[in-house]
Amino acid sequence: MTRVKRGNVARKRRNKILKLAKGFRGSHSTLFRTANQQVMKALRSAYRDRKKKKRDFRRLWITRINAASRQHGLSYSQLIGNLKKADIQLNRKMLAQLAVLDPASFGKVAELASQAKG
């Protein structure tokens, strides 16, 4: 068999991992084996939490909308149901922004929703 010289390839592979581990504490940023484990764990967590972030924000928006709609005498589910009946197409992010930044406008939207009950 012929000899395969892989010194450069191996060093590049290790340096790539160590570069990703920059800023980790202790040996996690200097020793290849522990750095490799921590980088894999960090990438797994980052992937998982990108998905979780979407769920977390939706929960936050719903909580804010619920709190604001109860001030106008509607529960969250009633508000959303009535908005659908009235064909008002505001998503939860927009409604939450209105509730926080412009409560008067949110009040108008809630009023329209309560009129659409029937």
From Swiss-Prot:
CDD domains: Ribosomal_L20 (cd07026). Binds directly to 23S ribosomal RNA and is necessary for the in vitro assembly process of the 50S ribosomal subunit. It is not involved in the protein synthesizing functions of that subunit. SUPFAM superfamilies: Ribosomal protein L20. It holds the Pfam family Ribosomal_L20. GO terms for cellular component: ribonucleoprotein complex; ribosome. One of its GO terms (molecular function) is structural constituent of ribosome. Keywords: Ribonucleoprotein, Ribosomal protein, RNA-binding, rRNA-binding. InterPro entries: Ribosomal_bL20, RIBOSOMAL_L20_CS, Ribosomal_protein_bL20_C. GO terms for biological process: ribosomal large subunit assembly; translation. The keyword Ribonucleoprotein applies. This is Large ribosomal subunit protein bL20. Belongs to the bacterial ribosomal protein bL20 family.
